[in-house]
Amino acid sequence: MRILFTGGSGTAGRHAVAYLAERGHRVLNVDKVALGHPGVSDRLADITDAGQMYDIFGAYAGYDELEPGTGVPTFDAVVHFAAVPRLLMTSDNECYRVNTLGTYNVIDAAVKFGVRKIIFASSETTYGICFADGERKPEYLPIDEDHPVVPEDSYAMSKVVNEVTARSFQRRSGFDIYGLRINNVIEPHEYARDFPGYVAGPDLRRRNIFAYIDARDLGQMVECCLNTDGLGFEIFNVSNDDHSVDLTTQALVERYYAGVPVAEMDSTETFYANKKAKKMLGFAPKHSWRTELSG
């Protein structure tokens, strides 16, 4: 596939871009800084500038695309990850502006250029727990895509707005637009660096409801979306299968979630339900912090 990927130089994006490139996809990375990954083209741009987005969608991805003499090819898909990645990096209103306006511009350009598959990064923060003022408990466990989204911060608000924006574009266009509520992304080097501390101090993972997503498995999730057509608008949680701490489901519930309704769950099953992605997309996360630390 010929894929336009925004934000491919970021923490989550660079692993997804590498995964897609290794799987044979042609990827144009659009970001404020170049990725420099072999076989991936880079284009520097600002997603909040609609003119720059329209220009990129109508431009060649590399010199080789000049050779056929048939004009600029249409992208097969857009993967939109570019954003202010969390709160407290800039002012609240700037975080909200960049994330909402940028997403509008990318999806608008994609639809107007006839790109029929759009995948965008939403967030675990939409559920209102991660960046809450004080402790917020889920209404039930595990959290699935039907759980209420009531965020308190500008970052999570922007992600909820982006889901509404995407739904509106999908209804008008009929294209496939899938949103990924991505949990805390873990890069391979972070297992040895951080997870012993999480085992010793599980409180550190409470705001992420003890869940995580391996950056390489996130790449697989993106490709699962690329390979699945005809779903219209859908939202998917993205997480690995197990808790990010060395406590059982029962122990975590007793310590942190007293009074929260809990469905029947396995002893290490994530509180951030990924069953929808498995059923509808064939998502099959391969990594676990336990095997990463042991081998």
Regions found by a protein language model. Give the residues of each.
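Conserved beta-loop-beta element that borders a ligand/cofactor-binding pocket
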Residues: 122, 163-188
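A conserved pocket-lining segment of Rossmann-fold NAD(P)-dependent short-chain dehydrogenase/reductase
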Residues: 145-152, 179-213
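Catalytic helix-loop patch of NAD(P)-dependent Rossmann-fold dehydrogenases
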Residues: 97, 133-174
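C-terminal substrate-binding subdomain of Rossmann-fold SDR/epimerase-dehydratase oxidoreductases
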Residues: 216-295
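NAD(P)H-binding glycine-rich loop region in Rossmannoid oxidoreductase-like domains
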Residues: 36, 47-98
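Glycine/proline-rich active-site loop of Rossmann-fold NAD(P)-dependent oxidoreductases
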Residues: 172-176, 185-200, 224-235
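Conserved Rossmann-fold NAD(P)-dependent oxidoreductase catalytic core, especially the SDR/UDP-sugar
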Residues: 105-152
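N-terminal Rossmann NAD(P)H-binding glycine-rich loop of SDR-like oxidoreductase domains
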Residues: 3-23
